[in-house]
Amino acid sequence: MGMIAGIDLGTTFSALAILNKIGRPEVVPNSEGERLTPSVVYFDEDQDATVRVGIEALNCRQLNPDRAIRWIKRHMGDSQWRKTFGERVWTPEEISSLILKKLKQDAEMIYPNIQHVVISVPAHFDEVRRKATMDAGAMAGLNVIGIVNEPVAAALYYATTHDVNGRVLVYDLGGGTFDVTIMDVSGQNIQIVCNQGDHALGGVDFDRKILQMFEKTYQEQTGQPLITNSQEQAQYEDEAEDVKKTLSRRPVAKKILYGKAGSARVEITQAQFEEAVEPLV
């Protein structure tokens, strides 16, 4: 029997893991040597719309953000979502399959015998989204033998390293989706009590609150908008994420904003950020 891998097909990052020789989970590094692969796909402007996936796609996004696809997980199972590049129309499942294919191909450089996969999904995913995830795996050439709820996967891993018995709450706020699950755990036996979530709430929405603060500050200081095109949008989305990370470590983040009307200085405190995101939490 071939090796079984577990895949976290995330909104912002994805990863593939296997059980190593001593039975411990091990995240397999990608071809860039990183354990996390950005869930980004970029289509070149050539006639064939050459596809780039992962960090390469993320870097190319600054060149032409309109040809980059991010956060595709939010559209899984949406029959109305379509994007055209070159002469081909792409569905969310087909975009996701490109990410899954890269994960598998990169992992097979180290473990060439991966034949089956289990893919984790948000607990609140309905059957349409779950089937779409399995379809994406099949398009990537994977034999998807199972779908597991992300909070259950987290609890299973925790149970392998800790003595857990009782009722457990798993709070899973990811890059683009949110789950809260209550479960009864006894060793590695898990029974779901209830779960709730939002497939359109995650870290990216916190970034957007900071982006709004950027825009407000810049307009107050210059009288002009900060963001006027998709390239500037992409640039400041990344800078907003950097500020969010800074505020997780420090009480204040400072940045100079450069726009067509000149520069503006912005300072955001943890308290200001918490107030801005309070409606989300």
Write out the residue ranges for each language-model feature.
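Oxyanion-binding/catalytic loops of NTP- or PPi-dependent enzymes
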Residues: 1-75, 79, 84-89, 108-281
